[in-house]
Amino acid sequence: MSENIAKRYVKALIEVCKKDELNDVLKGLKAIVSAFSVAKFNDIIKSPTVSKKDKISLILSFLKEPNVKIENLLKILMKNGRISLLPQIYDGIKESIALSNNEYQGKIYTKENLDEPTIKLLETNFSKKLNANIKFVCIAGNYTGVKIDISDLGYEISFSIDRLKSAMSEYILKAI
């Protein structure tokens, strides 16, 4: 439910801001959103004893140059008790800008981290193939094989070593 509410604010910001203004808003929100990972900050924001004006002042203190659009957004969110939606609004704006620039984020799941040249090679090849600018993040885990996921475009490619072994065993048994 909160995602739908955040999408409304994102849509409103996109309609109100020009492209360069939207980038400035995104930079400002990035500084603010990073504070939401600090427990003390969340305690202050949720505290009923701290006035809304003081909360807005605290949030604006994270910005080097306060933006009128950000200030108005903060006032509206604070008035409606939805200041906790800021991280989701930030993600929505970031995603919208990326989509308008034809940029997509992908994930590579492997057992070990891939080196930077390999990731760059994959980014280049997928960017050419999909006619978009693709950036990958490597996530090391217990995945035996390689899985590439570009969820925004609906692409998922996986190669499992276990599956290869079973297919080879099956093929050898059929050949005998």
Swiss-Prot record:
One of its GO terms (cellular component) is proton-transporting ATP synthase complex. It comes from the Bacteria. It is a peripheral membrane protein. GO terms for molecular function: proton-transporting ATP synthase activity, rotational mechanism. Transmembrane segments: none annotated. It is found in: Cell inner membrane. Keywords: ATP synthesis, Cell inner membrane, Cell membrane, CF(1), Hydrogen ion transport, Ion transport, Membrane, Transport. Belongs to the ATPase delta chain family. F-type ATPases have 2 components, F(1) - the catalytic core - and F(0) - the membrane proton channel. F(1) has five subunits: alpha(3), beta(3), gamma(1), delta(1), epsilon(1). F(0) has three main subunits: a(1), b(2) and c(10-14). The alpha and beta chains form an alternating ring which encloses part of the gamma chain. F(1) is attached to F(0) by a central stalk formed by the gamma and epsilon chains, while a peripheral stalk is formed by the delta and b chains. HAMAP family: ATP_synth_delta_bact (MF_01416). PANTHER family: ATP SYNTHASE DELTA CHAIN (PTHR11910). This is ATP synthase subunit delta.
